[in-house]
Structure formats: C-alpha cells, structure tokens
C-alpha cells in the first residue's frame, strides 16, 4: 500500500499513521477483521472492528482509484496525449469524480454534434467566438463557412446558413464547457447543495400507483430529504408510477456558467452565453443531475444498509435460552399445529400434528399429546411461532397447567418458511416436509438464535428498510460483515456447531467448515484445538485466524474452552508456573488470578491489552457476551386487532427499527408502528439511539384502523389518543392529535408525506 494512502486514511478517519499502516499490513497478510480486533491489539493500538472495517473498505476504494488512474494514464499514453502537466493532474486526483473530470476531454467518445461541427471545419470559428473580442462580428465571421459539408458513413452533413454555422460553433463551445473540470465542480456543488428532488405522477397511473399518492406532486431539498423518502420516490419511479427530477434553481446554474465563461456583453459573448444555455440543458445539466441522483441514492443506500445491519446485529445477538429440551410449535388453524421435540443439542426426536382449535375431542387429544411429551421427555421450554393462530395456541398451551419452570415463549417466524424450503433444510431433514422443518427452526431459534439464523440469507430475516432497492452488493457485504462479527464475538463450539455456523468463523469458509464436520463425524469429537491442523485445507494461517474463536469443552488443554488463543498458551503456562500452580488452578481460584503481575509479562508482541483479555478469560472462560434470557409474555386477552382500544398500555417487542420509527409486536398478529415523533418525550433524531430489535417496551395504543389493520403506538409518557375507526376531516394540529385522520397522522415530520402504505406493508408481510 502506498504511503500517501496511509496518510490520507489517517486524516480521514482521525487515526494514527502507525495504526493504519499496521492494519493495512495485517489485512494484506490475510488477517480477518475479528482476528485483528481481538488478537492484535498491540499492533493496531486497540482499534475496534468498526475502525478496522473502515480502513479495509477505504484501502479497497483507493486501490480501485489507483487501478483506474493507471488505466487512464495508459490510454492517454497509447494515444500520444499524455503530457507532463496532464500526468501530474491525473496523479493528483484524490477522488474518482475528480479523476474522471480530468479525463473527460480526452475520453474516446461517440460522434457528437460537436465532433460533426469540427468535421465541418467550424473549430476555428468556435475559437474566435470563445475569445469574445468586442470587435468580432459573429455573423460576418460565420459567412465563409456556409456551404461546408462532410460525409461520414455515407451520410452527408452540410451547414447551409449562417445560423447553422453559428449553431455548429456553439455545439463545439457547449462541449468545451461541459468538459471543463472547474465548471463541472461548480455545478456539481450546486446540484448537491441546492438541488431539489421533485416527483410527479405519470399520467393515467393514479389508481395503480395509489400507494405512492403522497409523491404525486412532491418536492423537497435533496440535501435534507430522509433516506427512506428518496428510496420511496425512486421505487415509485422504478415501478413506473412517478417521474422524478433533481435540479437546482436554473438561474443559479446558468449564473455559475456565465460567471466562468461569459466576458461582457459583446455579440461574441452572447454566442458563448447561448452555448452555456445549451450546455446546461443538453449536456452538463443532465450529467450533473445523474451524478447528484447517484450521490443521494448512495447516501440513502448507506443509511438503509446501516439500519438493516444494526437491526440484524441485535437479532443475531438476541439472548439464547440455551441447551434445553424444547418443543417447537408452528401454529395453524386449518392444517393444525406442527409440533417437534428437540433435545438439548437441537436434534429432532419426534414430531406430530395437533388440532387444538377444531373440536373438543381434538383439543383433548392435543392436550394429551403435549402433556405426554412434556412428561416423558422432561421438556424444559416451549417455543411457539408468532404467525397465524399463535396467540390461540399460546392460550391453549397455558391452559395445560404445565410446571412454572417451563418457559412458554413466542418466537419470530420471520424467514422460517424460507429456511424450511431451502437446500440447507432439505439436507438436514431429507425425510421430513416443510412444516416439520419450519417447526424445528422455531424451536432452535429459541435455544440459540445465532446458530439458527446464520442458515438464512440475512435479507430474508425481515429487519430491513427498502432492502430490495439498495445496492445489493454493498448490502450483502455489510450484512456478511455483521454475521461474521456476531459469530466470532460469541465464539463457536467446535464439536456441536453446524457447518453453516462454522463457515462464518474467522479463517474458515464453507469448504473448510464442511471438512471440519466430516472429520468430526468420522473420527469423533475434537479433543484439542491442535487437531485442527489435521484438517485438509486448513493450514497454519487459517489455524491462526480461527483457533481462538473455536471452543472445545473438556478439551485436552483447559484453555481450549476459552477465547485465549493457542499462541498464548505458553504464556499462561508460565504465569501458572510462576505462581506455583496449574492453569486449572488459575481458572478456579480468583486469588491466584489476582496475584498475577501483568507487568512481568509485557513484551513488544504482548502488551497490557492482551494480558488483561487473558485474565478476563481465565475468570470466565468461553463466556457468552449475549444477555441472559428473560421470558416475555404478551397481554392476556388481547389477541387480535379487534381487541385493541385507544389508551391501552401493552407489553411489546421491537421487531424492526427504521429511519422513520419502529415496528412493535404487541401480540395481535399485526405489528404496530411507533412513529419517530412518538418514541420519546425527548427529541429523537435517530430511532436506533433509543430502540433496538428485540427490546421489550410498554406501548400505548394511539389509533386503530380496523379496515386496514393498522395500529399507531406511542412510547411517550403522555399520549394524545386518536380514534378507533378512521375519521375524515380531522381537526388538524400536530400529528397524532385527537380526531385527526389516521393516514394523515402517519405522514412524516408533521405532515410531510412518507410511504405509509409501504411502511405498513413491511409489517404486514411479517404476519400471515
């Protein structure tokens, strides 16, 4: 990596040069982000995963820039256009935009109006006009060019009049203005700073595009438009219902060009002015609009991806129930409830279908089936999917008078149907149908959400915002980073983990993970981390990256169950020897751990950060960083939207956090929306600062729209209630006030349109 890149990244991220340089070297050596953050703190100055990821991404961006720079230099050199001055300009371009602006005048292009004008011999006239000499008479100077013609590809172009000659000369000037780097920079800033995003309805699409009705005639400054509104407008355009533009005030755009290129008010200057007008309308304006739209689309994508990634992290790190014998129930009315019995390792032991809601006799049979499984297999928990018939099934189970020690927990079904039809599920359960696989997934999600959710494409989990509209490559990378981060943060039990979970461990991939599982199945459980080196395809580098994140209970070495890396076993052995005890004694005796003098073990490679991590691991080897599991129950007697009344205070769980608010499951088969204005009594700029996916809340029902099954909730201490049914012609005032039309309340920012239909569609898609 070039030294000037290190300096640039240092300045951009506010880090020390040595931190950036060390991280760059480690990444180049093949180290992963989790490994660097956990086991190379001394080299990086204790950078965290976020900082390391930022360095990694910026390095890749700068390397891409350098590749493009070399390509441009090569192209210019081959065409004998590369001067020392131009080489210096290309070399100094700090961004891809600046680089492309420099290259634009020299870029091979298709035949344009300007090239045709040049072929007609009008370039000398354009130069004369460009000079804007007050003594120049444009029409007089143009007269000698009348009648010029050129034939290209059997097509003849001719300038027959003075007006056509001047128009051709202006075409040359317009392209010259368009290619000017200063003009492009000036206009780019104007479009970004003062551009207005406008959307209008495509004629005849009122009914089809009703969900975008808020945008049928809408405009706002692009610089302050929330990401979800930009994405909503773009979605409406993509679906053919909206026409959108992003432009600054035209007078300012023209004024910028006039200021750069027009000198005075002579006839020649007027020709340059007309060329500026044409350039803005036909060339530069279009180009800058595309750039500005791309800029704000990327910005909106980044925000939406960040929201998705934050939500996914919270979901993956949700509290696990742990290894308990569990019943997983996928509820249903007509087709019955699919029940599976899982042992403490999540292995499927039995399955059957019960029909608790069809008749008294079948309900008794269902009760007997559940009670028998609980009694015979000593069931410790029951997981119920939160889809159709979930509350009814929960009520049925709770009527069985089960021991209070058995937790009955509602579990999100989001993505379960996708898993049940996946190749992974077919491999795991080739002899069982979709319904059984789905119920297994529900039960396992309660036991260990992380281990089960890694089997899904993160995009199918349902905690995103406009996830199908954003840059899919960027989304995938961000979500993959989150999954890798979470898996390695928690650590993986080597002898029980699935190959799907192992594949996300630092240093491993799907191939080496499959080899690990195959070796385990053939030779029995791993007895030590050192055995990993016997795996085909897993060399010393992969071992270095992976070993610390893999745990072996009751392994050959007492530290195999901890996050202490094998490269530090010798150090811990020395600590124990210096105290006259064993490593096992250090694990068991707090007094002995307290007696360790860390300063004695500091070396250039091992500093206090690593030593403190080691001692922390000795205190709680292999500790799970996830919070302790706490059972949650919805309010009894409130099982469907029709049961709700304004003013009810209900327990709920946050299921999705977006830029405009959060969705909360209150147990009625339909998530309610807590608009950003109703999250807190304090001002809320970013909902994610106040709420997380999986967070338990007490929500107040504000309004209910029964026909459309929409629920408005509030988390504020003082709530102004709306109607139970939608009312037209509300009283106005602040959003959510009593008597105001419900759909109007759901608009953004006190009346600014949002995509209410899209928002609620997101929630409705979660619940069958």
Where are these regions (language model features)?
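Long, charge-rich intrinsically disordered scaffolds of nucleic-acid metabolism proteins
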Residues: 85, 98, 102, 409, ...
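A glycine-rich phosphate-binding loop feature that marks nucleotide/adenosyl-phosphate handling sites
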Residues: 189-196, 329-333, 387-392, 411-418, ...
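Duplex nucleic acid-engaging cores and interfaces of nucleic-acid transaction enzymes
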Residues: 48-54, 61-328, 334-432, 439, ...
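C-terminal accessory/binding modules appended to enzymatic or scaffolding proteins
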Residues: 14, 319-321, 484-518, 636-672, ...
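Single-stranded RNA-binding regions, centering on S1/OB-family and related RNA-binding modules
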Residues: 552-768
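Long, charged amphipathic helices and adjacent flexible linkers at domain junctions
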Residues: 292-309, 425, 460-491, 600-646
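Accessory alpha-helical DNA-binding modules that contact the DNA backbone or grooves
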Residues: 32-33, 44, 48-152, 156, ...
